[in-house]
């Protein structure tokens, strides 16, 4: 499993914190950020890299998280969530099989962002009754 990270200029500093943290935690991290590009291009880079391999997960950071969430969910097969707390990050993996989260650097601080990232990447999809929802989401895009 690789954790694919991306950011725009507003999220790059927090993304670097997350990259260092996740590497220290022993995760394989790939940073696809092109700091000269908009959040749309960087979000697409993360989402496409996540979709390249079933086990990949993605985290995209900009100022507020909303824009990247909208971009990511336009891609076929991508289930993403905009999160600002640990529980939502963990639950969106377990119940929604989200493979990507978006964060806002102006919303969450460094420690919260680290907790969110860890909750997301250690979570696992529960399957079962949740698969009906996942199938419905995947039919939409």
Swiss-Prot record:
Keywords of the record: Isomerase, Lactose metabolism
UniProt xrefs under SUPFAM superfamilies: Ribose/Galactose isomerase RpiB/AlsB (SSF89623)
Catalytic activity: aldehydo-D-galactose 6-phosphate = keto-D-tagatose 6-phosphate
Single GO BP term: D-allose catabolic process
GO MF term list: galactose-6-phosphate isomerase activity; ribose-5-phosphate isomerase activity
Annotated metabolic or biological route of this protein: Carbohydrate metabolism; D-galactose 6-phosphate degradation; D-tagatose 6-phosphate from D-galactose 6-phosphate: step 1/1
Keyword Isomerase belongs to the record: yes
EC number(s) per entry: 5.3.1.26
Subunit structure: Heteromultimeric protein consisting of LacA and LacB.
Family: Belongs to the LacAB/RpiB family.
HAMAP family per UniProt: LacA (MF_01555)
Protein name, UniProt field: Galactose-6-phosphate isomerase subunit LacA
Originating organism: Streptococcus equi subsp. zooepidemicus (strain MGCS10565)
Gene designation per UniProt: lacA
């Amino acid at each position: 499993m690789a954790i694919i990270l991306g950011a725009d200029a507003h999220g790059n500093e927090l993304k670097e914190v997350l990259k260092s943290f996740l590497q220290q935690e022993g995760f394989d991290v790939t940073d696809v950020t092109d700091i000269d590009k908009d959040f749309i291009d960087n979000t697409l880079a993360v989402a496409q890299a996540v979709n390249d391999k079933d086990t990949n997960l993605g985290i995209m950071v900009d100022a507020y998280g909303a824009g990247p969430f909208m971009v990511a969910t336009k891609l076929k097969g991508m289930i993403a969530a905009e999160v600002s707390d640990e529980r939502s990050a963990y639950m969106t993996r377990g119940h929604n099989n989200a493979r990507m989260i978006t964060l806002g650097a102006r919303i969450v601080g460094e420690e919260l962002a680290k907790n969110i990232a860890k909750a997301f990447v250690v979570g696992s999809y529960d399957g079962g009754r949740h698969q009906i929802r996942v199938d419905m989401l995947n039919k939409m895009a």
